[in-house]
A protein has these predicted regions:
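A short, well-structured beta->alpha microelement
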Residues: 29-49
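Short, polar loop motifs at secondary-structure junctions
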Residues: 42-43, 56-63
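Conserved acidic residues
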Residues: 52-53
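Alpha-helix N-cap/helix-start motif
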Residues: 17, 48, 64, 82-83
Length: 100
């Protein structure tokens, strides 16, 4: 993978999964991180998650062993796109694992 890839995993949360992905893409870009932020709906396709550097789950779907990368639960973003503690955890994980 040449670009840092973040995948937002959701299911029956509908448009919220896309809203979360867009919010995170903007937040990470503003922080200076060039990331490819995509979505994966387990409701439509319960297959292995796409290859990524970081998996963000709106519902429990995959383990780190299955994903092959760090996995964070970001369920609070379903209700509040600005949930500070969750956004901080995501940013810290990206900072820790973003290629130099």
């Amino acid at each position: 993978m040449s670009k840092y890839r973040v995948v937002v995993v959701g299911g029956w949360c509908g448009n919220r999964m896309f809203m979360v992905a867009e919010q995170l893409k903007e937040m990470l870009a503003a922080a200076g991180y060039a990331c490819d932020v995509t979505t994966h709906s387990v409701w439509e396709n319960y297959s292995r998650p796409p290859a990524a550097n970081l998996l963000l789950q709106l519902l429990p779907a995959f383990t780190e062993a299955e994903a092959g990368c760090p996995v964070l639960t970001v369920k609070p973003l379903i209700v509040d796109l600005q949930h500070a503690a969750t956004l901080d955890r995501i940013l810290k994980q990206v900072q820790a694992s973003y290629p130099a």
